């Protein structure tokens, strides 16, 4: 099929086409086609019945020319970034640059700037501009493009273009720098499918769109009353919007070919009735009295005629005729245009003019550093894109306003000194103030700038020390000012060692403040602490002035070897293995007897057996030294009998061996004093004593306290602990738990070389015990006291239950406390909006009136089982008879060199996660009148070996 038009790529005009265009002389009307397209070739000419060559490839900035023979219009097809094919090419180029992240805002600005540049060329080189829209409605963003075009023409082009045109063959165009105020037409390639495609409906749709466009362009001063100040022109009383309602554009070529094939292969059935054939034979010629076509009514004829006339080409030619007749601006503007405003050029003049515009606006723009003597043009090349990015300036202005508002909000609310948490809160408030004004792509960078300014303001003499206390509270003192003592401003309420006096304590920042200095200070204000009898726990005694804290490897070698006791040599390990093998071969009955009479342990319940080894480990070598006496005790127990007593009655009894007075002295003399264990006098233990710390290292100060606050009579089980004696207890939680312990006394065998006087004296004493029977029933009162930071104190009657009064105390209640792991932290039952954690701080023990001593050896497991802290005494303390004793636990626990902070909140499913007190801390032994309980250092290492753990 022969084409009735020519097409070429600017500026390569064919010679034959050039000759045809020369014949038009000064009757050439240039029409520019711009807008959107969806096809691969970026073709917007299909509505005009034209298309580029098959080998044509879309390219940004390319101009494809079309000329139809016998017409006076030259059509310029501008390929811009609004064409989907070219837009896809730009996206592919951006995606290939993997080092630079894809920024949509900058990409959109760059795409729009390139389109504006090509539109400027079209508006200055054409008489008529047809904007093609693939949608069904007018795109409001086009108004923004028109505003940018008007700004670019008035602020850039008119500053250099008239002057630079005077220096070219197109000097006659220098005054207005354009052919005319170009008439803008709008072509919509698609009509709404749900609307009927009648003349009335299509015309109504076109008129409605024209009114909308006219109002928008007039409102934004794109079209004014003067042609010189108008960017474009709109015809008066003439259609400038066209909807393609009847022709299908950009249809699938394969589907079209298949449809043509089906039509070619279709053959209508020509058979007719026999009667008709007889009549047709009488006809003088074929087709006689038969109509050529089916009858058509007037409406159908009118509809067909409307389809033929309603084409884009006819729509365009009406405006071309206005240009040829010289009435192009008539009715478009209220003010009469000046002479020479509208100009028609011949092909040669127009070609020179187009070449100048294309070079100035498109080609030179590829190199912003293009050498030129015109300063305005140089500014145009360098800042054209930046000047069009009005959104960027708008967002920058908003972010600047938000930045000022946010910084002001931060500085106005900032106190004289504040910490990191306050700084973060102020910064969050400043961010909220910023977001009231600032937004857009630059908001992220502006927020970072605001954060840096606020950070600098904070660090400029307003920063707090923020050294964390042992309770994780920051110091509130200024960082830049020297201070000897930290202060977090947090105040806790704590009781003294004896529990009688409560006082306010500052948040501690070191272990000495937490576990020693506060209790020494409050003891001076307590009239009971100065009177009580304190048990002297072992502490470091330096022999030199330059003593220091032990290094980690020296202080805690067992953590690296993985052992829980003192290092042994290879021979010792082999002996231990041999002993273990022999022990496994013993009969079950013999093992039971040895366990019952080993002088160290007699469990009352199965819950105690699992903690037996750990409990024994704390007593040191004294237990090993008492193995010989344990064997003698076992033989003595087997020979002893008790008349009228069944085995069932003795099942839960504890066996206590009674030794002769001279035997106790000999055993103690053989073992030597407790201070025979060598301790370092140059290095001290930096933390608390635990089961794997070196026995030779002692702490600088005691973190525990063991004190006798008075006789047992000061406690009445009917009234509990009174406020004048123990203050701060919650109602109903101030009772100790009674504990009944059954003992069976076993006498050691007498030595043959004893004097008759000693035998007679001891015999009388033993006879006096026998009158009381060989069994003793001890009543001990025990209380596990918890204390929260508000000073609330309460007792626990079970690991998961707070004592609520005397009604909660039953016969076996105390066994739940002493034979189970007691949590180190428990939620305080006080009524407060904030959940406070109470800490196990004291263990109350009221010893019985009996010829035995209660031995205490508390062990606290903290740090998920990593550390088990002890009193640090090789010899477990013996409590005097018929007395009220209180063990005060450490306020803060510190392992090797790391603080073990309390949990922020207690998990309901794991109350022991923060730590727990191990069971089996109590023991019982025969009273030895030769021992001085107040001076444990003088006690023999085996003084505590002969006792029974409860």
From Swiss-Prot:
Disulfide connectivity for this sequence is none
Q: Where is the composition biased (Low complexity)?
A: 624-648
| Any single GO BP term | nuclear-transcribed mRNA catabolic process, nonsense-mediated decay
Xref: InterPro entries: SMG8-like
Task: Establish whether keyword Kinase is in the entry.
Answer: no
Keywords annotated in UniProt: Nonsense-mediated mRNA decay
Short name of one Pfam family: Smg8_Smg9
TM region positions: none
Composition-biased stretches (Polar residues):
593-607
- Bias (Acidic residues) occurs at 568-582
The segment annotated Disordered runs over 560-607, 624-651
Q: What does this protein do?
A: Involved in nonsense-mediated decay (NMD) of mRNAs containing premature stop codons. Probable component of kinase complex containing nonC and recruited to stalled ribosomes.
What protein family does this chain belong to? Answer: Belongs to the SMG8 family.
Q: What is this protein called?
A: Nonsense-mediated mRNA decay factor SMG8
